[in-house]
From Swiss-Prot:
GO terms for biological process: flower development; inflorescence development; post-embryonic development; translation. GO terms for molecular function: mRNA binding; structural constituent of ribosome. The keyword Translocase does not apply. The gene is RPL27AB. This is Large ribosomal subunit protein uL15y. SUPFAM superfamilies: Ribosomal proteins L15p and L18e (SSF52080). It comes from Arabidopsis thaliana.
Amino acid sequence: MATALKKNRKKRGHVSAGHGRIGKHRKHPGGRGNAGGMHHHRILFDKYHPGYFGKVGMRYFHKLRNKFFCPIVNLDKLWSLVPEDVKAKSSKDNVPLIDVTQHGFFKVLGKGHLPENKPFVVKAKLISKTAEKKIKEAGGAVVLTA
């Protein structure tokens, strides 16, 4: 009865079992770990880990992260910040005030459209030109805070 043997069982009894005569399947022929990344393993490092070696640009040593902290909100999300009861009461004469800093945003950007015939006053630390233009075109106003 013939049985299909695995490769390593087939090789048993043949001196070095397919692993050669000198190295005999020993130790670390290519070096350990990431050895040779700039030399004999360079092709693999470049192919599978591009950018692993080398430097880019300059580091900002004493960067104050809070100085650059500026969470943003787009125009199309502004109306969703208004509570439902305030939305119901709003009219041309009684427009809602949206203070974006109370919702955790500092800057208003101009992506998207505002709802038709629903002007409102936006209070923010920063605002882009396009956002300001769209809010004013819709009949609203912008208040900048410190």
